[in-house]
């Protein structure tokens, strides 16, 4: 079915937000001051990252999104040698600034809540508890968090990658989807394999997976189908350079 014909869902998205700034250039000489190359910038691209990337991907599926995030975004600068498509280094701005999470009184018009927590201080256990207290019983809450202790996200659908899952403290009763990179994803005792692709850039793939998982779950009400959809979308995103946002054409071509 064409994405334009599908139902629109209302989503509340809460999380840390950033700008991914890509500096493309060339290194064609060495510095006379130190044994390092001189980077000559040719062009620059700015993309929305972290929870802002989740938002854009949710909107690609036709969802209406209310986004609550840090007012002053973190900025991640990546310097890329364009000829070889090689990232030279990255520096970040704004992580050290204290943030004050403020959540408005929530309406009951949401179909799901999504928490994209990069553990930069915006989503605290207290903030999440305040949020949960206002939600009607049974509303699905999806959480992707880089916190080590995830027990505060009780009664939520947690998405986490494999390396983080090994270190995380998770309640055995929690529902957890573990992404396995090229091997797909694990939910309960099942492995959901994904097709092999040429990986170009994994930046933002987890955000695409999360947004697609939410879409698949709301559309089908079935976690297995949702994971298969998320696998397809994440596999597509890693074939693209930089933080990627699914297009309507992508979604229609994937027949999801």
Predicted regions and their residues:
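Active-site donor-nucleotide binding/catalytic segment of nucleotide-sugar enzymes
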Residues: 114-121
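Short helix/loop capping segments that flank catalytic or ligand/cofactor-binding pockets
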Residues: 21-23, 123, 168
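Non-cysteine beta-strand/loop elements that form the S-adenosyl-L-methionine
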Residues: 80, 155-163
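Short internal beta-strands
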Residues: 68-69, 141-145, 159-160
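Conserved N-terminal subdomain of the carbohydrate kinase-like
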Residues: 2, 8-14, 19-114, 245-256
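Conserved phosphate-binding/catalytic region of the ribokinase-like
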Residues: 95, 109, 126-155, 166-256
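Active-site metal-binding loops of divalent metal-dependent hydrolases
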Residues: 16-17, 118, 208
